[in-house]
Each structure stands twice: as structure tokens, then as C-alpha cells.
Amino acid sequence: MAQGKNKRLSKGKKGIKKRVVDPFTKKDWYNIKAPSTFENRDVGKTLVNRSTGLRLANDYLKGRVLEVSLADLQGQEDHSFKKVKLRVDEVQGKNLLTNFHGFDFTSDKLRSLVRKWQTLIEANVTVKTSDDYFLRLFVIGFTKRQANQVKKTTYAQTSQINQIRKKMTDIVVREASNVTLAQLTAKLIPEVIGREIEKATQNIYPLQNVYIRKVKLLKQPKFDLGALLALHGGATDDNGKKVNREFKDVVLESV
């Protein structure tokens, strides 16, 4: 006789439901801190499972890449089309210390810049900052009508495009290779490099809407906790202070 599973005996009682466990009871909230380069350092919060056994929460937090609107970091709606990527490098208590990981424009902003009767000029440059970060910067610019121009179109010649692209490359290398990553980030916010390119190319062909539209992190140096804490203005944990006691222990010479 074949031995098999008795379905009638193995059936559970009807009406008994499994206990539903809220998954959020096993998770903790962590505060995300942006570098001091930005006006608003409180980016938001993120969830992670609590440490259990060999699975540490810090291992799942470090390396997370977050995409934040620059308008939220600066408190200005003018930067709403700019996106900043922040990478979690260190966990201190319930605070996550982040560093710059990338920069980009929204797709709708890029589409709104492209118009008829003008020439789009792009360039990309790989630079090394003074603190050994390798970055690739993507520049975009558009020709505009010259003063007293009657013709509708503003198409640049191939020789002019090559000259403008050479100017873009030289200015980006000059502005980015002699500064730290934090200083370069500060230049990206007010579009300092874009205005420099517009001034330098005025004699070749007038440009408008010149931006660093994207920054890609290619390679980073070895992690330095001291440099990260300096970027965040010191440690974020609330450390206690030493208390000076007014009394001293009395030692009895004889009992």
C-alpha cells in the first residue's frame, strides 16, 4: 500500500488566520545629512532593517545613492531642474553623512532648451580635482542672435563650433582641476563656469543657455573620515562633556 500524505489530517482549522506582522517594526529611521556646501543639510529620512546577528544595518546604509532636487537643498525654486546625487559614506548614530556623487538636469529642462534655428554645441571633459576625484563634466550651449541681426537663423559654422568647443574644454579644465570637490560643487550651483564660457566665446559666436548639464563621478580616492567630517562641519553626534566633581574620595588611614 502506498504511503502518502493524508490531506484530511493535515488540513488546518478553518477560520484561523495567520498573524500579520508589520514589517516596519523591524526597521529604523535614519536622518540623511547633506554636506555643508548646501544651505539645507537635512535631506530627509531613510529606512533600513535593524542589525540582527551578522547582518549589520551600517553595511546596508553605506554606499546608498540618493537623488535630491537642488531646489530643496538650496531653498530656491530657480534650481528645480537640477538634480544632485548624494552617496552615504559614514553612519554616526542615527545620522548618515553623505558626499557629492553626481549632478544632472531633468529631461524636461533639456528638451525645453532645444529650439529651431540655432546650433547646439556640446563638449565633455574628464578632469581630476585637487583632492584626487576623477570627474567627467558635460557642457551644453546654444547659439543666439547677434546684435542688429536680421536673419532668423543663428547657425554657426563648423570652424566656429570647433573653436567654441575648444574654449569650453579649456575653461572647464582650468576651473575644475585646481579646486576640491566641495569647491567645484559650490561653482555648479550659481553656474559660474557657464558664464565664463559665454564671456570667452563672445568674439567667436554669441552663446546662450550655457550650462554644466551633467557631472559623472568616475573614480574617488581612498575614504578619509577626517575629510568627510570636515565637509560636514565636524562630528554630528552629541558627545557628553566631562563633569568636574567638587568632592574627593576620603581615604581612611586607619580603621
From Swiss-Prot:
Domain of life where this protein originates: Eukaryota
GO molecular function, one term: structural constituent of ribosome
Statement: the UniProt record of this protein carries the keyword Ribonucleoprotein: yes
Predominant subcellular localization, coarse grouping: cytoplasm
Gene Ontology annotations of biological process type: translation
The keyword Acetylation belongs to this UniProt entry's keyword annotation: yes
GO terms for cellular component: cytosol; cytosolic small ribosomal subunit
Modified residues (N-acetylalanine): A2
Keywords: Acetylation, Cytoplasm, Ribonucleoprotein, Ribosomal protein
Compartments, as annotated in UniProt: Cytoplasm
UniProt record similarity statement: Belongs to the eukaryotic ribosomal protein eS1 family.
PANTHER family for the chain: 40S RIBOSOMAL PROTEIN S3A
Name of the featured protein: Small ribosomal subunit protein eS1
Gene: RPS1
